[in-house]
């Protein structure tokens, strides 16, 4: 059985900021491509969410075409993936999301 996905407010804000950035500095096509890439990564996580553990119980899934990492945790008992943040890897590591 696949996991359900719960996206945090911080992650939603991260995604909105990335889309706004790509709309402003590139094109709407690039912004749509970012959203498509994010959704594709989430779909890849759902059937098998056991990616690399980054910190404590937080896992990471790097995006391929964009410099972002998806941070998430698992509730294995209830089969829920909690997406905590979508972090731009071009920012300094000091700015990593406070998990």
Residue spans for each PLM region:
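Basic, Lys/Arg-enriched alpha-helical interface segments
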Residues: 1-57
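Enriched for short, Lys/Arg-rich terminal
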Residues: 73-99
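Basic/aromatic recognition patch in beta-strand/loop cores that engages polyanionic ligands
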Residues: 39-40, 48-80
């Amino acid at each position: 059985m696949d996991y359900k996905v719960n996206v945090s407010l911080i992650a939603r804000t991260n995604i909105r900021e990335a889309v706004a950035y790509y709309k402003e500095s590139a094109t709407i096509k690039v912004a749509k491509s970012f959203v498509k890439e994010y959704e594709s990564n989430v779909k890849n996580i759902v059937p098998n969410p056991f990616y690399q553990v980054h910190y404590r119980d937080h896992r990471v899934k790097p995006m391929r075409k964009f410099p972002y990492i998806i941070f998430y945790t698992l509730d294995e008992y209830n089969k829920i993936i909690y997406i905590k943040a979508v972090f731009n890897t071009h920012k300094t590591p000091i700015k990593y999301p406070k998990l």
